A protein has these predicted regions:
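Alpha-helical segment of the N-proximal tetratricopeptide repeat
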Residues: 43-79, 86-89, 93
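Canonical tetratricopeptide repeat
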Residues: 85-86, 120, 154-155, 187
Length: 266
């Protein structure tokens, strides 16, 4: 399975980090068990701290711990869109689609202009092959972030997989290689996979991994994994350093891209 891309907010209010202390010569340093500080009594601060702990637990994939902290955050300050959005992200990772969709819809009821919840709800619908509904949510997300490549890519995939070949082809024709984003290569790979041309698709994916950082690629490759076109191993295929195009060189190899016209038709 892929690592589903979800968006949520972590506001580290008043979080202070402690630096590592050097151990004395000859001493063996052993890590001390981490003791969590008591939650603040003030309701607003309690809500914030518990939310941050929930987000941190989510990032460690401690999903039950994240839900526990969210319950505390909810009790301190009920009906918060950020809490509902994070709860949806947790249930998405647990692949509990019903609860995930319910949580994201609640987040949007509480805060209709929350772009993260629009994207995340679109992702759940996309993963469940509800492409027209997913496209609608990604479109709303893009209304607030019109140049977001991941949102544009998701819109394109919705058109491609729903059989809206005219819209998909129109958007694909606007794309060119971009030194800042692998969207061109993964959109072309998706088209090739959809047409059954695995050789061409794999070449586009390999080209992306030769050019762009792994994190940038995995964001786009995830959707191809979720749809069964790629495996997790293929997402991290090693490339030789001497064959990898450096980012400085890439800027001279690829033409500048006009992104203003690179938006799928509504």
């Amino acid at each position: 399975m892929g690592k589903i891309i979800l968006l949520f907010l972590v506001s580290l209010v008043g979080l202070v980090g402690c630096g590592k202390k050097e151990s004395r010569a000859g001493e063996v340093s052993t890590p001390k068990p981490k003791i969590q500080e008591p939650l603040p009594e003030d309701a607003e601060e309690r809500y914030k701290v518990a939310y941050i702990r929930a987000a941190q637990a989510f990032s460690r994939n401690d999903l039950e711990g994240a839900l526990t902290s969210l319950e505390i955050s909810d009790q301190a300050k009920p009906k918060q869109a950020s809490n509902a959005n994070l709860r949806g992200a947790i249930f998405t990772r647990k692949r509990d689609w019903v609860k995930a969709e319910e949580a994201f819809r609640l987040a949007l009821q509480l805060q209709p202009d929350l772009p993260m919840a629009q994207f995340n709800l679109g992702e759940v619908l996309f993963l469940n092959n509800k492409y027209p509904e997913a496209r609608e949510k990604f479109q709303i997300f893009l209304n607030s972030q019109p140049k977001n490549d991941l949102g544009l890519y998701k819109m394109y995939l919705c058109d491609l997989l729903a059989g809206n070949s005219s819209k998909a082809n129109d958007y694909l024709s606007t794309l060119k290689p971009d030194p800042m984003s692998p969207i061109y290569y993964f959109a072309k790979a998706a088209e090739a996979f959809h047409q059954g041309d695995k050789v061409a698709a794999t070449e586009f994916v390999s080209s992306a991994y030769r050019i762009y950082p792994p994190d940038a690629n995995s964001t786009f490759a995830d959707s191809l994994v979720e749809k069964g076109y790629l495996t997790g191993e293929q997402m991290t295929a090693p490339t030789q350093d001497e064959n990898k195009v450096k980012s400085e060189e890439l800027k001279t190899l690829l033409p500048p891209v006009e992104k203003s016209g690179s938006k799928p038709k509504s």
